């Protein structure tokens, strides 16, 4: 399975990082407290949009050939996108840790670090890179979720906790997670079904911030998800395909938010 392969590779990568810079050194570099900016933009009136910076994926291969993270961030800065998700996973998504630093220089939007967090080391690293939030995936962490969630909060990060089914949702709720991301993509098969959000949202308490991820292709999809009670959507591939046309992406966002 692709997910198992990603996790195996990620664990090796983190061990190499620890060898170069031990976790104790990393912890000493942490500065700044909790801004809460990521959670704030998801909770504002109307549906919020998280625009993703993503060059590739295991299911689609290269999505954006002439990839420039700074150029993409500048587009997101100009249109009514509320937060930016930055893919930092190198091997399978062609991401890079430095993209967060680069984006931070040109954008005022809160940044979500999108990666496969398998070690506490990556949480400290995310804070130092300048992320406002991290993604924690229940199918990757299992019973480690609570500890990783609490550590993330303690260093001043918001946490988007990703689930795909009812069992994973229960684990997230038991850990006290306040931002739940429903991934419409099954990470085991990479099949996508936007109805996953509709099927799971009814089991999520009302005081939880809900994000729908994957398979969101049109403004109509976003308005449909908003009607279900979703607070925010995360859009990657759809935006990457039109990112060079600022008018097109601006119109898409306006229409999705009901102003088009």
UniProtKB/Swiss-Prot annotation:
InterPro entries found in the cross-reference section: Aldolase_TIM, Indole-3-glycerol_P_synth, Indole-3-glycerol_P_synth_dom, Indole-3-GlycerolPSynthase_CS, RibuloseP-bd_barrel
GO molecular function: indole-3-glycerol-phosphate synthase activity; phosphoribosylanthranilate isomerase activity
A GO biological process held by the record: L-tryptophan biosynthetic process
Keyword Transmembrane helix: no
Domain of life (superkingdom): Bacteria
Signal peptide stretch: none
Pfam families to which the protein is assigned, alphabetical: IGPS
Pathway: Amino-acid biosynthesis; L-tryptophan biosynthesis; L-tryptophan from chorismate: step 4/5
Catalytic activity: 1-(2-carboxyphenylamino)-1-deoxy-D-ribulose 5-phosphate + H(+) = (1S,2R)-1-C-(indol-3-yl)glycerol 3-phosphate + CO2 + H2O
EC annotation from Swiss-Prot or TrEMBL: 4.1.1.48
Keywords for this protein: Amino-acid biosynthesis, Aromatic amino acid biosynthesis, Decarboxylase, Lyase, Tryptophan biosynthesis
Family: Belongs to the TrpC family.
Protein name: Indole-3-glycerol phosphate synthase
UniProt gene name: trpC
């Amino acid at each position: 399975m692709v997910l198992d392969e990603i996790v195996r590779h990620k664990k090796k990568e983190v061990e190499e990082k620890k060898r170069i810079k031990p976790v104790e050194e990393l912890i000493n570099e942490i500065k700044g407290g909790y801004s809460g900016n990521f959670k704030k933009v998801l909770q504002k009136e109307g549906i919020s949009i998280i625009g993703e910076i993503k060059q590739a994926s295991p299911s689609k291969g290269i999505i954006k050939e002439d990839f420039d993270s700074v150029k993409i961030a500048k587009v997101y800065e100009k249109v009514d996108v509320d937060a930016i998700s930055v893919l930092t996973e190198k091997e399978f998504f062609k991401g890079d840790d430095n993209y967060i630093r680069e984006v931070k220089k040109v954008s005022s939007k809160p940044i979500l670090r999108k990666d496969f967090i398998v070690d506490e080391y990556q949480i400290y690293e995310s804070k130092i890179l300048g992320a406002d939030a991290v993604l924690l995936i229940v199918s990757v962490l299992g019973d480690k979720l609570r500890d990783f969630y609490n550590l993330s909060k303690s260093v001043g990060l918001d946490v988007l906790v990703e689930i795909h089914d009812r069992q994973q949702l229960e684990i997230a709720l038991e850990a006290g997670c306040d931002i739940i991301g429903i991934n419409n993509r099954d990470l085991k098969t990479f099949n996508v079904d936007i109805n996953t959000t509709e099927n799971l949202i009814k089991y999520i308490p009302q005081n939880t911030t809900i994000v729908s991820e994957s398979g969101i292709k049109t403004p109509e999809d976003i308005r449909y998800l908003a009607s279900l009670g979703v607070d925010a959507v995360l859009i990657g591939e759809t935006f990457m395909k039109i990112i060079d046309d600022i008018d097109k992406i601006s119109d898409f966002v306006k229409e999705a938010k009901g102003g088009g």
